[in-house]
């Protein structure tokens, strides 16, 4: 299928693989929470969407209604490189047509790759009449559970989750990094400073004054990369535990309180306690609860979770979590969304939202105007 616009600009929807090309450099890794609510957006929580930034690459996971506005209110209109859909329920998908069209109206030229379960192609094709003509290339890639999508120094792995429709979770898994270079040992082995040092750090042997020098002679132990896991909508399942084992951050569905466990099971969602139990079994460093309904008080949600797994947070829209390399510290909140510049000045809060605004968001940073 090809949609064409006027003039020279056109789009081809292709079905091959498209890999981003990034320069090799130390990579920051962060998650911006654009939508943390349930199926119905509220004044404080939008529908599902997460923006993962790693180095120079931007990966969007799900694109609920209003995602582009959430971007513009916090980060600006981010030119994402790839979009990953967990499934095609409306609250995870309805923001896509508008985002694609806005990119066109702002004269985007760089290609965009969209990944998702089977049915992605048909769904995007059916939106052609709504979106109209757009002038950049879009690659549509339908994936299966267990696929690994290469990124620089990492891969995004899909895994099956248990929801009411075909659904995936995603794990961003970095490869181990080389150990630290020991220049003193290299000099002692007769390696010249300069290009030979760089060659060794790339993992290639060089000739020293005393004979061949292997990188293992001058490099420390390999350093682990980071793992970030996003479940999308799911009941608790073994596949999530395995994908998240030892992860820096697990972002897990927490749609229901414990008293509604049967409803969670019937609809393919998790209770707060079930999400916490998955995190505990997987031994993750930090659990972030999302898909939280506005009918629950966030304080109650966190109390239930922390009874099972203490390092749990309930991010609000616009919160940003930074994931440093393991040797540099733990995942941490670096920006809190409960800030006046990101709050609509006029909406009337429901009783649940008013309670949330008064009692904080569980991240240790009170909303504006509240006591410490």
PLM regions with names:
Residues 31, 71, 87, 114, ...:
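Divalent metal-coordination and catalytic microenvironments
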Residues 61-64, 81-88, 117, 229-232, ...:
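Active-site neighborhood of phospho(di)ester-bond hydrolases with catalytic His/Asp-centered motifs
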Residues 41-43, 152-242, 249-251:
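Active-site-proximal loop/helix segment associated with metal-binding centers of metalloenzymes
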Residues 145-146, 238-345, 357, 371-372:
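Binuclear metal-ion centers of metallo-dependent hydrolases, dominated by the metallo-beta-lactamase
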Residues 57, 65-115, 137-142:
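Active-site metal-binding motif and surrounding structural segment of the metallo-beta-lactamase
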Residues 95-103, 127, 297-306:
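Metal-dependent catalytic neighborhoods of phosphoester/phosphodiester hydrolases
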Residues 27-76, 111, 170-172, 179, ...:
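Conserved beta-strand hairpin/beta-sheet module of binuclear metal-dependent hydrolase folds
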Residues 11-13, 361-362:
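Short, positively charged low-complexity motifs
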């Amino acid at each position: 299928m090809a949609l064409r616009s006027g003039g020279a600009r056109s789009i081809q929807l292709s079905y091959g693989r498209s890999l981003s090309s990034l320069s090799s450099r130390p990579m920051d890794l962060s998650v911006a929470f654009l939508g943390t609510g349930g199926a119905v957006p509220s004044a404080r929580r939008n529908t599902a969407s997460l923006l993962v930034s790693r180095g120079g690459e931007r990966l969007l996971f799900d694109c609920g209604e209003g995602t582009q506005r959430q971007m513009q209110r916090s980060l600006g209109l981010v030119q994402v490189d790839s979009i990953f859909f967990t499934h095609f329920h409306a609250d995870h998908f309805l923001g896509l047509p508008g985002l694609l069209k806005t990119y066109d109206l702002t004269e985007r030229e760089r290609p965009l790759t969209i990944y998702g379960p089977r049915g992605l192609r048909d769904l995007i094709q059916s939106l052609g009449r709504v979106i109209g003509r757009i002038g950049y290339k879009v690659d549509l890639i339908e994936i299966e559970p267990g696929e690994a999508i290469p990124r620089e120094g990492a891969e995004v792995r899909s895994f099956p989750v248990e929801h009411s429709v075909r659904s995936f979770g995603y794990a961003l898994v970095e490869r181990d990094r080389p150990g630290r270079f020991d220049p003193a040992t290299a000099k002692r082995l007769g390696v010249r400073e300069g290009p030979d040092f760089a060659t060794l750090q790339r993992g290639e042997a060089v000739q020293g004054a005393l004979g061949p020098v292997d990188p293992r002679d001058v490099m420390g132990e390999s350093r682990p990369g980071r793992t970030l896991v996003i479940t999308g909508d799911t009941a608790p399942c073994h596949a999530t535990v395995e994908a998240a084992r030892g992860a820096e951050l697990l972002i897990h569905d927490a749609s229901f309180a414990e008293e509604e466990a049967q409803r969670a099971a019937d609809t393919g969602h998790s209770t707060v306690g079930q999400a916490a139990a998955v995190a505990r079994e997987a031994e993750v460093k930090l659990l972030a609860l999302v898909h939280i309904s506005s009918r629950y008080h966030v304080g109650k949600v966190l109390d239930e979770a922390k009874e099972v797994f203490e390092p749990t947070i309930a991010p609000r829209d616009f919160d940003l979590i930074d994931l440093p390399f393991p040797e540099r510290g733990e995942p941490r909140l670096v920006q809190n969304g409960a800030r006046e510049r990101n709050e609509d000045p006029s909406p009337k809060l429901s009783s649940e939202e008013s309670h949330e605004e008064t009692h904080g968001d569980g991240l240790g940073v009170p909303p504006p105007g509240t006591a410490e």
